[in-house]
Amino acid sequence: MNRVLSKGPKGLNGLLRACPSNSGRSFLYHSTYNVSSRTFWSASRLRSEDSPSGSQPLKPDPNDGIGNNTSSASSQHTPWYLQEEALIEEPRQISSRDQIPELPENSPAILPVLLDYIFKDLGLDELRLIDLRGLETPPPIGANSIMIIGTARSVKHLNVSADRLCRWLRSTYKLTPYADGLLGRNELKIKLRRKARRARVASRAGTTVDEKDDGITTGWICVNAGVVENSPVGEQASRKVEGFGNIVGGTRVVVQMFTEEKRAEVDLEGLWLATIERDRRQKQVSIDTKSDAPHEEVRAPTPVQNSSSDHVFGPHCRSSTILPLEQRRGLHSKCRLLGPETEHNQEDGLDDGLDDGLDMSPDSISTPTDQLAANRTCDKEVDTDSLLEHLSGLPDGQVLSELGAGQEDRDSTPFLRRFYDALSQMSTEEAAVALVKLLCTAISRHHQGYSKESLWKAFMTCNYHTYPISDELGFEIVSALLTALPPHQKGPKATGVLPEADRELALRVLEHLSLRGTDVLNMKVFHLLYEAASHPTSFSGEEVIKDVTDATKDRPTSRVAKMIESLDIQFDPEDARKLMMSMFRNGDYDGFWNLWHKLPLYGSPRTSADYEMLFRLHADLRDECRARDCVSTWVPMMSREHPPIPLRGQVVQDIMHCLLIGEPAIDRMARAGSTSNLVLIWNDCKNIALGRGRRGSVERMNVV
């Protein structure tokens, strides 16, 4: 076998050639010494033995694509994660969620910073800026406002964004924003916990909790930043003013935050855009109407004063054009003033007395310039003010008779004739303000011919035309509207009843005053509100409450007192003393003593008039226990005041009256030789009243 199968490749090759193939195909073989990297061929061809394997390079079959694919794949194949995509040259579309709205003209300096903070730091989407300056905006927003509307991503994002915005405005710009609908950080967590607890309890009981308005998912928070810029907005060509109150110089910024569902439901921007479009159309119509109308001759608002060198002497010819609401004034040598003593005369005597009020005869005036200057001192506004001042000093009965039958009566009394005569010669602005003052006086004196509705209409007329109303006059209007019905009235409208409609009118006046910039959070306003709360709203609520200690907490006045304590109101000594008297008469003794102790702490030392009021109130109360405590405690304190209060005058009579209430038999006890503190005070007061001037007992009590 070894001889047949010779060793080496040649022997094996010969054996394979000698063996016939059963399938008609030859076996392919590879040399064990000459290994090729080529794979097996699929074609049925024999390899020539004569051709050496390594002499010439192998040429692949043209029909075989494996060689080409292998060589090209090694050079062109790249994994997918290393392949670079071709850059898209089309510009990226920026949605409205990623845009900051454009700034309007004459915008405040804080507006771009505020928009950037809301967009980048707070993360509100779909910002929309609406310029409401010049429009009639509702009172909660205020006049001259710029509104920003944004969308939060959730209820929690809404509350957190509003809270951060308020804190940022306070710390960065020292503003005082307020957010309607905002829940505090802890408050939101507590409410969410309670809601989850109720849901768990309901699920255990097999029921569902249906809370449509749980106070959490309102989805709307309004952050009013207030006035962010005090400089006035550029005046437009038109002088027309919309809304109520004076022209507000500053610009307000209001940020409206919504959730996506609530914003789509409310559609606030749609409402305001429709309002702006309607206002634009109205202005366009008015401009077209004015352009088509013929030009009219008008008088300049301020007369031009020529110098003395330009003055032309001689007759001055006036235009024959009749101007509407034209003032006609004449030069008089006498100023008509109404003295208090002339009102008691007869009707004829009153006319003479008014003409003889102040003599400015031509003898005392040398030149026409002096006559003109003297005439300017007798302005008609001062004339009406003097008439009203004289009227306010008269008793109630005489005031009612002087005011005539009612508002339509203008000539039944000398006062009405003089007043409306002066009113006809005044400008429309001055006449409207003077009429408001007359209505306030008439309503405060309980004249049935002058209604509170007419006062409200007169006030709104002044607001609509932006007539100047002082803060003092505004508070007089509120006081007149809060005046209770007269004591002598019978029937359903009983004594001291203040209807709810009158209270609502007074609160609306305070709201308009607040929009004009008037400080309504003061002692005077809260005293008026306290007085109004002490009156019942109907006949059924007029019953007197005897048990003060049990019913004080349920009274409406207690809520006003709590507001006074909680708010940081500037202390006004005069109004505080009035509020003290109202509290004592209403049974709020704790509030009375609280203000009584605050007087010296706020730099207003107690005076003799204060002690007279103290002892008189306790005497009128006719409570024996309170009267005794008041006398025994505060009579010795009079000498410790700074400066000390002397025991003399009217305060002595008030102390003795209070002692008689607290101890009816005190005079008999004094004659019996009692040495109690009240008897010692009684003896001192009695000696001072008799002119003996002894105060030894009170001084000994102070030492003790």
Curated annotation (Swiss-Prot):
GO BP terms, alphabetized:
mitochondrial gene expression; mRNA stabilization
Which segments carry the region annotation Disordered?
47-76, 283-313
Q: What's the superkingdom here?
A: Eukaryota
GO CC terms on record? mitochondrial inner membrane
Where is the sequence biased in composition, kind Basic and acidic residues? 289-299
* Keywords in alphabetical order: Membrane, Mitochondrion, Mitochondrion inner membrane, Transit peptide
- Chief location bin: mitochondrion
Q: Is this entry keyworded Mitochondrion?
A: yes
Keyword match Mitochondrion: yes
Q: Where is the transit peptide?
A: 1-47
Q: Where is the composition biased (Polar residues)?
A: 66-76
Q: Where in the cell is it found?
A: Mitochondrion inner membrane
The membrane topology term of the UniProt record is:
Peripheral membrane protein
PANTHER family to which the protein is assigned, alphabetical? ATPASE SYNTHESIS PROTEIN 25, MITOCHONDRIAL
The job of this chain, per UniProt, is described as: Probable mitochondrial mRNA stabilization factor.
Give the protein family. Belongs to the ATP25 family.
Its recorded name reads ATPase synthesis protein 25, mitochondrial
What organism is recorded for this protein? Aspergillus fumigatus (strain CBS 144.89 / FGSC A1163 / CEA10) (Neosartorya fumigata)
